[in-house]
From Swiss-Prot:
Signal peptide: none annotated. Gene3D superfamilies: Nucleic acid-binding proteins (2.40.50.140). This is Small ribosomal subunit protein uS17. The keyword Ribonucleoprotein applies. GO terms for cellular component: cytosolic small ribosomal subunit. The gene is rpsQ. Part of the 30S ribosomal subunit. It comes from Pasteurella multocida (strain Pm70). Keywords: Ribonucleoprotein, Ribosomal protein, RNA-binding, rRNA-binding. GO terms for molecular function: rRNA binding; structural constituent of ribosome.
Length: 85
């Protein structure tokens, strides 16, 4: 068994919850028959103790123990702040 902690980067798509937000992680998958690359999106609920992340930010998250029914990821750092127009 490996003890490597998974960490990924994604974009914050919702920050309406207290101490939580939703991250969308995009990946490209090749269609098995036609060979075209298709974008697939995974949405993850993330714990944010200090409410640091805002809508549109690029964040790095890591896997942790289950914190609730849907939350098992925590915020590591905000990689890039969203540009406010």
């Amino acid at each position: 068994m490996t003890d490597k902690i998974r960490s990924v980067q994604g974009k914050v798509v919702s920050d309406k919850m207290d101490k939580s937000f939703v991250v969308a992680i995009e990946r490209k998958v090749k269609h098995p028959l036609y060979g075209k690359f298709i974008r697939r999106t995974t949405k993850l609920h993330v714990h944010d103790e200090n409410n640091e992340a805002k809508l549109g930010d690029i964040v790095e998250i890591k896997e942790c123990r289950p914190l609730s029914k849907t939350k098992s990821w925590t915020l590591v750092r905000v990689v890039e702040k969203a540009v406010v127009a």
